[in-house]
Amino acid sequence: MRGTDEKYGLPPQPDSDRMTRRTLPVLGLAHELITPTLRQMADRLDPHMRPVVSYHLGWSDERGRPVNNNCGKAIRPALVFVAAEAAGADPHSAIPGAVSVELVHNFSLVHDDLMDRDEHRRHRPTVWALWGDAMALLAGDAMLSLAHEVLLDCDSPHVGAALRAISEATRELIRGQAADTAFESRTDVALDECLKMAEGKTAALMAASAEVGALLAGAPRSVREALVAYGRHIGLAFQLVDDLLGIWGRPEITGKPVYSDLRSRKKTLPVTWTVAHGGSAGRRLAAWLVDETGSQTASDDELAAVAELIECGGGRRWASAEARRHVTQGIDMVARIGIPDRPAAELQDLAHYIVDRQA
């Protein structure tokens, strides 16, 4: 029987392995651990900015009324906690690091929505769509500032190293986002460039999440390096799956319009691979990408035909296989260092969740 995963270009998995059908315990625990401190940090903001950040984080509606909304997956905080546990520490000791990476991640989302002019995230209007460009910029900046503050408030002797890891990852994230933006006006984006962009835009913060957890736990260098490599691999897998969902994801699950990435003519990984290796389908896709006459006005039927070009050219299957290859490599990296059974299993679960998710 064909599984749901095939709909997204992913090989069917046994029902017992479909982690996208349930919330991983480690993700639920991550939410529980970071929320009190995350709220305390948001309370430091001024009365103009606090409700905007509260809305984006899923705690309130646009009028400031409390809601229990989808506030994200918490994959990066979970990775901080599991990395700390893998190094033999109590996960609670890594709360400042987990809150920090979650704030950096959300800073990037608010700015990304603004730059892409995306009007919906997590089934709600985005910050810029409600409050305008200026407030969206400031909300993102505010969360980035809080990401530094929460670490500086920590009394760990490893705060300096953790803060450096966060800052370097943020710089890499900005580099990747800048490349992604530059690609919009180019017609000759190479696959290697697209992969380098994904390493900065997505994988850098995943790797830093693992590194921060290990640093705050005082892990030896060999453990830190293995966890960082794991984070980088699952970060690339995450971006590959994100790109698949940006074309074939179901709007009622992703919270974004159908064919959202194609409508914006984004040079995503499956698109770029198809252009380079997809034969006649790739050539037709390349011609469509440079044809600006229908930009932003393409019908769903036209976009469905473009998605079919990517399918026929092999981009969908390549992205799926590449995501699973990175997951396997990431798991192999941590298997070599002999960490305790529970965090080892949690790292495997996180990796498989990333490729099996539907949003």
Curated annotation (Swiss-Prot):
It comes from the Bacteria. Binds 2 Mg(2+) ions per subunit. Mn(2+) and Fe(2+) ions also support activity. The keyword DNA repair does not apply. Mg(2+) 1 binds at D112, D116. Isopentenyl diphosphate binds at K73, R76, H105, R122. Its EC number is 2.5.1.10. It catalyses: isopentenyl diphosphate + (2E)-geranyl diphosphate = (2E,6E)-farnesyl diphosphate + diphosphate. It is an enzyme of class 2 (transferase). Its cofactor is Mg(2+); Mn(2+); Fe(2+). Pathway: Isoprenoid biosynthesis; farnesyl diphosphate biosynthesis; farnesyl diphosphate from geranyl diphosphate and isopentenyl diphosphate. Keywords: Cytoplasm, Lipid biosynthesis, Lipid metabolism, Magnesium, Metal-binding, Transferase. Disulfide bonds: none annotated. Dithiothreitol increases the enzyme activity by 2.5-fold. GO terms for molecular function: (2E,6E)-farnesyl diphosphate synthase activity; dimethylallyltranstransferase activity; iron ion binding; magnesium ion binding; manganese ion binding; prenyltransferase activity. A motif (DDXXD motif) lies at residues 112-116, 242-246. Mg(2+) 2 binds at D112, D116. GO terms for biological process: farnesyl diphosphate biosynthetic process; geranyl diphosphate biosynthetic process; geranylgeranyl diphosphate biosynthetic process; isoprenoid biosynthetic process. It is found in: Cytoplasm. Belongs to the FPP/GGPP synthase family. This is (2E,6E)-farnesyl diphosphate synthase.
